[in-house]
Amino acid sequence: MSDHFDNGRFFNPNGADAQPFWKAPRMLFEHYAPWPAQVPVVQRPSPPPTSSDEIVVTFIGHATFLIQTSAGNIITDPVFAQRAGPFGWTGPRRVRQPGVRFDDLPPIAYVLLSHNHYDHCDLETLRALQHRDHPRFVTLQGNATLLRSAGVTRIAELDWWQRMPAEMSAMPGAQTLDPVVTPGREIEITATQAQHFSARTPFDRNRALWGGFMITIDERQIYFAGDSGYGPHFLEVGRRFPRIDLALIPIGAYEPRWFMKDIHMNPEEAVQAHIDVGARRSIGMHFGTFRLTTEGPNEPVAALGRARSAAGIDDAAFTTLDVGESARL
């Protein structure tokens, strides 16, 4: 078993942890910046790669990215629900619709699931992907039981720094994943450390692990940081993977700092994480879709610009995408 697991629960090696549940009511007395009920989004299919070597990364919203490659299509933390909470009628309401409709998604070969929080793990979406595409679900230790409850069958559970070479052939009984897959190309997925916590209820805290993923396609590397506070693990990511082409880094849900600092980075910390991992380019995520904390929906992007300037980083090196917008590698 993992060296960051003890007495039935996972933990962050540096001692960081979320605030205890009994402190959550204090959030009711914080000042919340206003959010709109809805922000218009133009939903459209994502553009396909124009060549076998091109990778297209589309921001669907929050922590959901569609990564299209000729080696197979990948989706991260897919959430298409209207609320990020249990039962479908509780939890923060979505204010930006997904940039790509579920029915417009291309065939998905891999689903990457960073942890079990409702804004990252939507069982209805996972169930729909399982039914439609029979993809392989790659997650962290302790999450398989939850996924099986949604009918998911092809599950790979990884510990931090564990690598899974990804076979592109469908398992027996599964339908073909993608007719445009290039034979012989391979995707490698490595679980990476994050500083966070897990819980679906008040009674299962840290029973399942959290993390991020490094996606290696040929010699190109895309880092999906998952949900994380700032910590020394980012330097370790950069040490283990010295040629990251693109990093997807959370920049939102960070106020108030007394409650969020250990588990969510603010934009200044996100810029430092970008520097630590040594990415050629980073794209911000985890903002402007669900009202999780007290800052306004647009403040993370504005603060990212200020932090980028203060650090002397070129504007193009760490950007954000509009919901539904794509970047090409």
Annotate each language-model stretch with its function.
Residues 124-129, 146, 150-151, 233-237:
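A short acidic, amphipathic alpha-helical/loop segment
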